[in-house]
Amino acid sequence: SNDVSWHEWKRMYNKEYNGA
């Protein structure tokens, strides 16, 4: 059930990466 965590992490990571 780590899929959700991974997806959420990647989403947040991508958002921060794009925001920067």
Swiss-Prot record:
Tree of life domain: Eukaryota
Q: Please provide, alphabetically and separated by semicolons, the GO molecular function terms listed in this UniProt record.
A: cysteine-type peptidase activity
Q: What is its EC number?
A: 3.4.22.-
Quick one: a GO cellular component term? lysosome
The kind of enzyme this is, by top-level EC class, is: hydrolase
Q: Which GO BP annotation is one of this protein's?
A: proteolysis
Q: Which UniProt keywords apply?
A: Hydrolase, Lysosome, Protease, Thiol protease
- List localization entries: Lysosome
Q: What does this protein do?
A: Thiol protease.
Q: Which family does it belong to?
A: Belongs to the peptidase C1 family.
Q: What is this protein called?
A: Cathepsin L-like cysteine proteinase
Source organism (scientific name):
Fasciola hepatica (Liver fluke)
